């Protein structure tokens, strides 16, 4: 049985196990059916620990759409989402190593890592995400820390299976030894490792990151429904939001700030924090739009906007509007978890973010307009498919 796309797992990278997400799967016995991620049912997206269960009347979908973002806040870019075949082998991924063509493989994204580390791995490097394997993950990390403290390189560690007998494999038809030639060195990039104190520091930083918890933003049901509508308009109906929006992200943030700052004394610490939060939302939006907030069908429009002389001096928050801004709040919990903010700062930020979400909900009829979406032209559809 091949693990489902968008499911979480543990994957070996070097001698350690890392939490990962399966973006694509490849099964040589079912070529053509499991080799790529489809845009059909959208993956469930968590907003902190809130999972949307809203159901649209015109369809059975009950999940919040992933606006190019994964539940843990990581990006799954075109390479992850679009299947490119090898020359002469239409059912084989282009970047799959030749020696792996006859076995089940998964294209994984390691949680908290940049997309450049996404890779195809053999089924023997993938474990189910369960208590036994999480225990194994901790044992491997402890062994690596001990080796690093003694000045040993990670490569000097025993093979992973020698450290524990508790590993529970992902359900597959066959399993090979972790000591095989296809283990950690597999993939298009060499595994980067550091030994001694540097390795110890890396592990300790990673351990700190894993201890952080994503904040749980309270998002009104009608905004969750708005996200589902947005997903369906773009991915199913092949519609685009007309750009530039009449009311942009910058305009919305200004209106929110004007309304919110009435509660604070000018020049007070609270007023300063509000200014920082508003500036931060704008910054996050501008930096993340092109990488995690767009559906694949919208990328051609984004390229046209960024290459247009009319918008060369504008930021994306001066072009896009509420539709794309709302998508940011799906990814924000994961993005915030990757910062170094202390618990008190996160709590203050959470309060302001939820104020802003309530503001969007209150003004939903003003900012979210169905007529903002228009059908894409046949020429655009051809360009979006690379024709």
UniProtKB/Swiss-Prot annotation:
Cellular location(s): Nucleus
InterPro entries assigned: Chromo-like_dom_sf, Chromo/chromo_shadow_dom, MRG, MRG_C_sf, MRG_dom, MSL3_chromo-like
Domain (MRG) ranges: 211-385
GO BP annotations listed: chromatin remodeling; DNA repair; regulation of DNA-templated transcription
Biased amino acid composition, Basic and acidic residues: 76-92
SMART domains named among the record's database cross-references: CHROMO
Domain (Tudor-knot) ranges: 100-126
Protein name: Chromatin modification-related protein EAF3
């Amino acid at each position: 049985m091949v693990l489902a796309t968008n499911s979480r797992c543990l994957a070996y990278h070097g001698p350690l196990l890392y939490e990962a997400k399966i973006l694509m799967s490849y099964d040589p016995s079912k070529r053509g059916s499991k080799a790529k991620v489809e845009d059909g049912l959208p993956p469930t997206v968590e907003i902190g620990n809130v999972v949307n269960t809203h159901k649209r009347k015109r369809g059975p979908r009950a999940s919040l759409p992933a606006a190019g973002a994964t539940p843990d806040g990581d990006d799954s870019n075109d390479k992850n989402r679009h299947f490119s075949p090898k020359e002469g082998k239409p059912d084989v991924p282009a970047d799959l190593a030749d020696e792996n063509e006859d076995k089940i493989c998964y294209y994984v994204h390691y949680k908290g890592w940049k997309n450049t580390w996404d890779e195809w791995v053999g089924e023997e490097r993938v474990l189910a995400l369960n208590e036994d394997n999480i225990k194994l993950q901790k044992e491997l990390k402890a062994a690596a820390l001990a080796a690093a403290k003694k000045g040993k390189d990670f490569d000097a560690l025993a093979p992973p299976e020698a450290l524990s007998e508790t590993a529970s494999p992902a359900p597959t038809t066959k399993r090979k030894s972790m000591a095989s030639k296809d283990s950690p060195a597999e993939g298009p990039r060499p595994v980067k490792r550091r030994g001694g104190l540097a390795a110890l520091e890396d592990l300790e930083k990673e351990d700190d990151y894993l201890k952080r918890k994503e904040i749980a933003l309270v998002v009104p049901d009608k905004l969750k429904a708005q996200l589902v509508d947005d997903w369906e308009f773009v991915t199913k109906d092949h519609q685009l939001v007309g750009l530039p929006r009449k009311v942009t992200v910058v305009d919305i943030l200004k209106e929110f700030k004007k309304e919110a700052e009435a509660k604070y004394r000018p020049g007070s610490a609270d007023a300063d924090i509000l200014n920082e939060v508003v500036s931060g939302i704008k910054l996050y939006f501008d930096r993340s739009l092109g990488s995690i907030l767009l559906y694949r069908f919208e990328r051609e429009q984004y390229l046209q906007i960024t290459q247009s002389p009319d918008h060369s001096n504008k930021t994306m928050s001066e072009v896009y509007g509420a539709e794309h801004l709302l998508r940011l709040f799906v990814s924000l919990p994961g993005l915030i978890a990757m910062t170094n903010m202390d618990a008190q700062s996160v709590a203050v930020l959470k309060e302001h973010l939820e104020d802003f979400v309530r503001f969007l909900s209150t003004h939903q009829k003003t900012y979210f307009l169905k007529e903002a979406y228009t059908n894409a032209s046949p020429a655009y559809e051809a360009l979006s498919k690379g024709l």
